[in-house]
């Protein structure tokens, strides 16, 4: 497993996200280390405390706010993702919550 702040510049993730900024935000909001996802279509993964499962989040090949810094795109994504159904608001470690807090 590769921690986000140690992902090599040759990794394709740099085209879509800023792993160093993402790690800073993960530390700020969750106090956790995020890792490069082992799934080819996801950017990062995190292991919630007291859990054996890994939560993968961030879709490749889509840029996130840590990369493009476009406030209009950020607003559109946050509006769209706020309407996702389910208990993601109650689950701090849901993929949607992680994407909203760390990537957007």
Residues covered by each model-derived region:
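Arg/Lys-rich, low-complexity, intrinsically disordered basic segments
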Residues: 1-104
């Amino acid at each position: 497993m590769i921690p986000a702040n140690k992902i090599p510049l040759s990794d394709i993730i740099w085209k879509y996200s800023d792993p160093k900024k993402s790690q800073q935000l993960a530390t700020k909001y969750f106090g956790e280390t995020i890792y490069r996802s082992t799934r080819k279509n996801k950017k990062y993964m995190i292991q919630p405390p007291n859990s054996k499962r890994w939560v993968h989040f961030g879709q490749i090949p889509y840029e996130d706010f840590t990369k493009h810094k476009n406030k209009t795109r950020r607003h559109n994504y946050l509006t769209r993702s706020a309407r996702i159904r389910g208990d993601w608001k109650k689950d701090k470690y849901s993929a949607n919550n992680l994407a909203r807090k760390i990537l957007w």
